[in-house]
Amino acid sequence: MESVMSKYENQILIFPDYLEEFPDTDELVWILGKQHPLKTEKSKLLSDISARLWFTYRRKFSPIGGTGPSSDAGWGCMLRCGQMMLAQALICRHLGRDWNWERQKEQPKEYQRILQCFLDRKDCCYSIHQMAQMGVGEGKSIGEWFGPNTVAQVIKKLALFDEWNSLAVYVSMDNTVVIEDIKKMCCVLPVGAADPAGDFLTASNQSRDTSVPCSAWKPLLLIVPLRLGINQINPVYVEAFKECFKMPQSLGALGGKPNNAYYFIGFLGDELIFLDPHTTQTFVDIEESGLVDDQTFHCLQSPQRMSILNLDPSVALGFFCKEEKDFDNWCSLVQKEILKENLRMFELVQKHPSHWPPFVPPAKPEVTTTGAEFIESTEQLEDFELEEDFEILSVG
């Protein structure tokens, strides 16, 4: 196994570069809902990009499942992209979209805690170990390549065990986002009005008017898996796809090419800007100080770009809505920019479709242990239902 991984690593390290240096142009660059005039704000643009957490292949971590691979080189790229999208959601949740990372500067304690959620250890809630093991419940063997929809389902299930970040993760189905279902999942009611610091219960079983604001809102990670063509992206979707990167709720997109995943964070013209996980670095652990050396978790090189028409049509868009007003604003933007198209990229509907099974907000299954440590073996995944993976990535 190790010799095979070494072969992969050598191939990956000499991966041909895409477009890197930004051209001399007056065009705007959009990065995760923020615009940067390229000519006047290039340094600010590069700083914004390097502030994103960058997760790549790693080697020399403890074997997954005790006897599995100790490197994810060659198969873990979509998992790493999923980690990057989720990490951006957590940054927005705790530090805000405008927070910026500065090299070798002391960072907020929330930043370190977020980073430690993704370390390559079985006891970290969003580690490669946890994601790969949870993928078994989605029909993926450990060491098998994941598609965007599978990663979205894995994130949704792992988030149930993450009490600190307390995210509601909604993964759309059949290219349709249902407002009523999201409000049921995210609106929470206090247990006893006299105790504002008390625990909260979801209002999922209550019939409520979704036009009435919630008393409290569980931060929402919204993932929309899409297929934007058969063997290649249909040009009719290009403008709507780009509009999603302009939305202030944007977490970018998961996608790429068959068996080569990238985390897309913005665009310039008709070129997508992405972070590339195809670099193999050595496992980094928590130091004696209790902190993590974060120098290898930020990409300090100029980001890569590719033509949007070269994108494989199987993608997943991500959005983060910290408060209910953010979600309501997102709905308005979708109605204005996405639903106006003759061939819509996805649908946004108010009510749960009558021909669908009833919506049941995801709940943590009953297990004997709690937190990330619960997935010690694939036998413990039987409480989760298998989600149908609709994506059919083109080959060749």
Swiss-Prot record:
Instruction: Keyword check for Cytoplasm, yes or no.
Output: yes
Q: Which residues form the active site?
A: C77 (nucleophile), D276, H278
Q: What are the record's GO terms for cellular component?
A: cytoplasm
Instruction: From the UniProt record, list the reaction(s) this protein catalyses.
Output: [protein]-C-terminal L-amino acid-glycyl-phosphatidylethanolamide + H2O = [protein]-C-terminal L-amino acid-glycine + a 1,2-diacyl-sn-glycero-3-phosphoethanolamine
Subcellular location per the Swiss-Prot or TrEMBL entry: Cytoplasm
Q: Where is the motif named LIR mapped on this chain?
A: 390-393
Q: Which UniProt keywords apply?
A: Autophagy, Cytoplasm, Hydrolase, Lipid metabolism, Protease, Protein transport, Thiol protease, Transport, Ubl conjugation pathway
Q: Which GO terms describe its biological process?
A: autophagy; lipid metabolic process; protein delipidation; protein transport; proteolysis
Question: What are the EC numbers?
Answer: 3.4.22.-
**Record's domain comment?**
The LIR motif (LC3-interacting region) is required for the interaction with the ATG8 family proteins. Required for proteolytic activation and delipidation of ATG8 proteins.
Assembly information from the UniProt record: Interacts with ATG9A; the interaction is direct.
* Similarity annotation: Belongs to the peptidase C54 family.
Q: What is this protein called?
A: Cysteine protease ATG4A
Taxonomy of the source species: Eukaryota, Metazoa, Chordata, Craniata, Vertebrata
